[in-house]
């Protein structure tokens, strides 16, 4: 996302090439995901259910190739956003980092960027308000990270395109979560690629008339031209609209006295019984206070408590550090 922001400021011909996800983690006969697995193992370690040696062994089994995390976390989400914005060649989002097709994608992208320079196909000719709305809907369909909201807002700001939380709420209402990936579901990015990758998701959204099919992409073709014939090879990894992972896929925007300008929630990864919940607020004034107190056995907290972390936004801390897990 930072590279896209820089490219947007320059408004030059640009093409995105992601590094690709790691291979699936394999540990003691089970498939384990990177971020999702780490948080569970960390909780088990702190609870005394596993030893530190067990933790390290699982971590080694989890990160067994180069590439970014293979769950639908920030990296996989933003790779999907780049492709759905039209800023990368088809399949860029999901090809594993060590797959030969990842290198082919990079080679073809290198050839294509030379042609884009000759065609003067600059970024502002590709990314529009419509392509942002396409990406928001794709984020819902893949169960994408809440981090997409701040990254997409920053890219839109550089391009002087008005993108608000209201757009996320409006566009997200129409889309169920179709992609059955951790942390919302079962599978990982390697499985997603073999099942058809992002083109298969885009095709399903196009079939329902949910995307602006005429949105332009970096190869000079439209989203519809690139993806309308894409095939899904595994309906459990990429679900149909008749059998979604969750019916409410889009990012939800919450407003109230605690967050008058809006707070966001990823319904596909949320526990259904917490959608309406009342509990005691346990407030931490800083990340440092949170880390110092969260494992204190004397902390007045239980399973119904609501943890509130202050002074941890993109400006104040800075960087909006991830500590919620």
State where each predicted segment sits:
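Short beta-alpha junctions and helix-cap segments that line functional grooves
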Residues: 2-4
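Catalytic or ion-coupling anion/metal-binding cores of large enzyme and transporter domains
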Residues: 6-11, 17, 21-325
């Amino acid at each position: 996302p930072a590279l896209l922001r820089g490219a947007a400021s320059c408004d030059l011909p640009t093409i995105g090439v992601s590094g690709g996800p790691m291979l699936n983690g394999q540990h003691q006969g089970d498939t384990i995901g990177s971020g999702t697995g780490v948080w569970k193992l960390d909780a088990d370690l702190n609870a005394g259910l596993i030893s530190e040696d067990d933790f390290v062994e699982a971590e080694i089994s989890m990160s067994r190739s180069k590439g970014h995390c293979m769950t639908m976390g920030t990296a996989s989400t933003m790779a999907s956003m780049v492709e759905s914005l039209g800023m990368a060649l088809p399949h860029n989002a999901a090809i594993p980092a060590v797959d030969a097709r990842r290198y082919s994608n990079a080679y073809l992208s290198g050839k294509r960027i030379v042609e884009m320079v000759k065609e003067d196909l600059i970024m502002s000719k590709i990314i529009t308000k419509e392509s942002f709305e396409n990406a928001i809907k794709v984020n819902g369909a893949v169960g994408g990270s809440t981090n997409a909201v701040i990254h997409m807002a920053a890219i839109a700001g550089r391009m002087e395109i008005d993108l608000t939380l209201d757009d996320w709420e409006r566009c997200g209402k129409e889309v169920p979560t179709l992609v059955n990936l951790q942390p919302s579901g079962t599978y990982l990015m390697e499985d997603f690629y073999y099942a058809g990758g992002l083109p298969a998701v885009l095709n399903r959204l196009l079939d329902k008339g949910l995307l602006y099919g005429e949105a332009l992409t970096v190869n000079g073709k439209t989203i519809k031209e690139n993806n309308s014939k894409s095939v899904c090879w595994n309906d459990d990894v990429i679900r149909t609209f008749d059998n979604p992972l969750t019916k409410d896929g889009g990012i939800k925007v919450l407003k109230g006295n605690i967050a008058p300008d809006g707070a966001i929630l990823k319904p596909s990864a949320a526990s259904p019984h917490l959608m309406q919940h009342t509990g005691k607020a346990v407030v931490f004034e800083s990340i440092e206070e949170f880390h110092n107190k969260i494992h204190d056995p004397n902390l007045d907290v239980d399973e119904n408590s609501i943890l509130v972390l202050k002074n941890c936004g993109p400006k104040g801390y800075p960087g909006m550090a991830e500590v919620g897990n």
